[in-house]
């Protein structure tokens, strides 16, 4: 290890991590999980990568993943010729992320049959599920433009409001993007999937403000009223991003041999940042990130359309403004202080969220006094949170915090232990309208499959790396 591995956990979350390590050593984990080594070992392996600075960090929702554990944050010195970029440090769903849209509606406005009607309208308008085709027409020329320009393309085409990009991380566009570095196969997959939600843990939820912790910050975000209706969208770059990652991993195998990069886990395949392979992956990954922002923008367009259909009102009359949009899987060039010296770093965040503090130049003007909004999606049927970044987080975690609850059971374990009918019935009993393309897959996303999101949030709060603003409760869930 070149640097320490630091894990942010409380006692209960630590027990889960240690149990995972114990089970693996004893050979008792299910065959479905055998491709991934325990998260604790993964965090330690990342700490041995060339060019890493300060520490390999793991957020409270950490669990095992491909190469990097999910919840891992790692930064690499751009001025170090040995420093690397790793697709495993970003993930296959590049710029999987979350956005929150507020409204001026209240829970009373969406009671009873209206709630079901809204859920049905969202399900009808937003394509969901594995391999589903897009609801937004897209030519190859359109695709190249949006891969380069991000949300600006959606604004030009009428799928986003001009103001939306101001409330997106990076203003909804990575300037390091180059569509020419995205393979034909990746583009082919992306052409049919613009404006689609996908499956797995992706969702569109109607939520209501359940609790306000920071009145000032909530008011500035426009979500300060208990019972206020919001919409949360969670999805990413779909098949295009997956193909970009797959392509890069194949290329980097050869680059590692050429440059004599020695790894303790093959899933950490990487390339020197300054190498041709490293530069081209960064450019392709950035383009895939732009696709994800446009995808969430298009789904926002479809969600606004669905609400207008049900309430027979224009979406701006319902104050359907974007609160913020954050990435959960990304690598970005950022400025940070390390050992008292400002450095240009390539920060990998995999299953973690940027959380910049007040007065940071890269967050919107209207949030300068409170810090960057941080959107934390819960599990299906459980609460979500809005946080803000802190100065302590900027100093200790490269301005990063958690991204969700984090899996406690593998997908295979969930399918074995849980019954999908019971999961669906429990949601209905809790007053949550549910529309799902593949009912049998809901067990994989049941609350029992995940850690307690409240424990995760509270751990971040106590550590001081982010602060709670609002808790949101779901009243309708749309899934693949």
From Swiss-Prot:
Residues passing through the membrane, by range: none
Note: Ligation probably proceeds through 3 nucleotidyl transfer steps, with 2',3'-cyclic phosphate termini being hydrolyzed to 3'-P termini in a step that precedes 3'-P activation with GMP. In the first nucleotidyl transfer step, RTCB reacts with GTP to form a covalent RTCB-histidine-GMP intermediate with release of PPi; in the second step, the GMP moiety is transferred to the RNA 3'-P; in the third step, the 5'-OH from the opposite RNA strand attacks the activated 3'-P to form a 3',5'-phosphodiester bond and release GMP.
UniProt enzyme class: ligase
Residues the record lists as binding Mn(2+) 1: 93, 96, 202
Protein's GO biological process: tRNA splicing, via endonucleolytic cleavage and ligation
Record key words, sorted: GTP-binding, Ligase, Manganese, Metal-binding, Nucleotide-binding, tRNA processing
Manganese is among the record's keywords: yes
Species annotation: Thalassiosira pseudonana (Marine diatom)
Assembly and binders: Catalytic component of the tRNA-splicing ligase complex.
Residues the entry annotates as binding GMP: 201-205, 328-329, 377-380, 384, 403-406, 479
Oxidoreductase found in the keyword field: no
Record's catalysed reaction(s): a 3'-end 3'-phospho-ribonucleotide-RNA + a 5'-end dephospho-ribonucleoside-RNA + GTP = a ribonucleotidyl-ribonucleotide-RNA + GMP + diphosphate; a 3'-end 2',3'-cyclophospho-ribonucleotide-RNA + a 5'-end dephospho-ribonucleoside-RNA + GTP + H2O = a ribonucleotidyl-ribonucleotide-RNA + GMP + diphosphate + H(+)
InterPro entries listed in its UniProt record: RtcB, RtcB-like_sf, RtcB_euk
Binding annotation for Mn(2+) 2: 96, 234, 328
Active site location: 403 (gmp-histidine intermediate)
Record-listed E.C. numbers: 6.5.1.8
Protein name in UniProt: RNA-splicing ligase RtcB homolog
Task of the protein: Catalytic subunit of the tRNA-splicing ligase complex that acts by directly joining spliced tRNA halves to mature-sized tRNAs by incorporating the precursor-derived splice junction phosphate into the mature tRNA as a canonical 3',5'-phosphodiester. May act as an RNA ligase with broad substrate specificity, and may function toward other RNAs.
Cofactor remark from the record: Binds 2 manganese ions per subunit.
A single GO molecular function term of this UniProt record: GTP binding
